[in-house]
Amino acid sequence: MDRHLCTCRETQLRSGLLLPLFLLMMLADLTLPAQRHPPVVLVPGDLGNQLEAKLDKPKVVHYLCSKKTDSYFTLWLNLELLLPVIIDCWIDNIRLVYNRTSRATQFPDGVDVRVPGFGETFSMEFLDPSKRNVGSYFYTMVESLVGWGYTRGEDVRGAPYDWRRAPNENGPYFLALREMIEEMYQMYGGPVVLVAHSMGNVYMLYFLQRQPQVWKDKYIHAFVSLGAPWGGVAKTLRVLASGDNNRIPVIGPLKIREQQRSAVSTSWLLPYNHTWSHEKVFVYTPTTNYTLRDYHRFFRDIGFEDGWFMRQDTEGLVEAMTPPGVELHCLYGTGVPTPNSFYYESFPDRDPKICFGDGDGTVNLESVLQCQAWQSRQEHRVSLQELPGSEHIEMLANATTLAYLKRVLLEP
């Protein structure tokens, strides 16, 4: 037989065998998860996601206020609702009503409030649905994640919540969060990275402290913490006493104070004795100075005794010395003047003079460094990353923050 003919036949035979084998390998590759990075859950801070409301009220505080709506509308953030006179309608709708008997809050009569977009990122990327820059929040971070290969609503999801309430009143939220984490684990073939900002970190600490270690080891890859008020925030005393407009110029501090007081999460974020000295004076007045041992008198003197009950309800929700039990990355801003104590010449209805300390402009350095204490209390790594000059909100778009997050997510 012709040697050349045999060689050709052998080559054809091998080719005939290799082609199906190659196709099988290609099909096998298609069945493998294409995911090469861990899924991400983003958790906002106080005021950090949209809220919607629907009205059917028995009465209103002003004739310009809507009494009934056919559908849900944006309650937060809608700058048009914060204009003079109209803001009275908004405050009456967004406030919570505290019941001392049940030790729980409820919505005002005829007001139903819901959190839009659980599992999505839109309600956290822009607080104002019109996407004005004043309401930009997680947008830059989500855009960065998309650039790294993530997809909104799929392997990067949001976990918004009713930030007016403390964790003890948001039970269904934590059930939904756990279910979403487990679903993402199954869909994308690996554990989740939690990325939280501000009060969202304390929410996640509450959540993680209540999960079995075996669950955390399976479902949580890492927890990236941005600007966490682990030990409370000094400015909370000013918020409760005389209000704080959160740098929104159209809102007067005293005007917004009623809403801020009614939010249980405000009292929850008062400074804690595991971080601050019992002797530290936070509020100075001509007649009385207030330390963290004087909260009961403080609430009585500002005419808001419900706040004392709220504090008692929430003070023990998170165990300060119990670490999260997962790999933790604490990123924190420094070098930005941060309210540390307040001097009132007329208490509590006038703006105080402010004494500043170190921090990110909102969260004091003493509070955010609480995570240092966990380095020796858990087996999982606890890393700290200082962000010099990084302000509390701006740190979400900080180049160092994004580079750090990228390393956590994409490096082996």
From Swiss-Prot:
Effect annotated for changing residue 89 to A: Abolishes enzyme activity
Protein name: Lysosomal phospholipase A and acyltransferase
Organism: Mus musculus
Effect of residue 392 to A: Abolishes enzyme activity
Membrane topology: Peripheral membrane protein
Keywords: Acyltransferase, Disulfide bond, Fatty acid metabolism, Glycoprotein, Hydrolase, Lipid metabolism, Lysosome, Membrane, Metal-binding, Secreted, Signal, Transferase, Zinc
Catalytic activity, as annotated: a 1,2-diacyl-sn-glycero-3-phosphocholine + H2O = a 2-acyl-sn-glycero-3-phosphocholine + a fatty acid + H(+); 1-hexadecanoyl-2-(9Z-octadecenoyl)-sn-glycero-3-phosphocholine + H2O = 2-(9Z-octadecenoyl)-sn-glycero-3-phosphocholine + hexadecanoate + H(+); 1,2-di-(9Z-octadecenoyl)-sn-glycero-3-phosphocholine + H2O = 2-(9Z-octadecenoyl)-sn-glycero-3-phosphocholine + (9Z)-octadecenoate + H(+); 1-hexadecanoyl-2-glutaroyl-sn-glycero-3-phosphocholine + H2O = 2-glutaroyl-sn-glycero-3-phosphocholine + hexadecanoate + H(+)
Tissue-by-tissue expression: Detected in blood plasma. Detected in alveolar macrophages (at protein level). Detected in heart, liver, spleen, kidney, thymus, brain and lung.
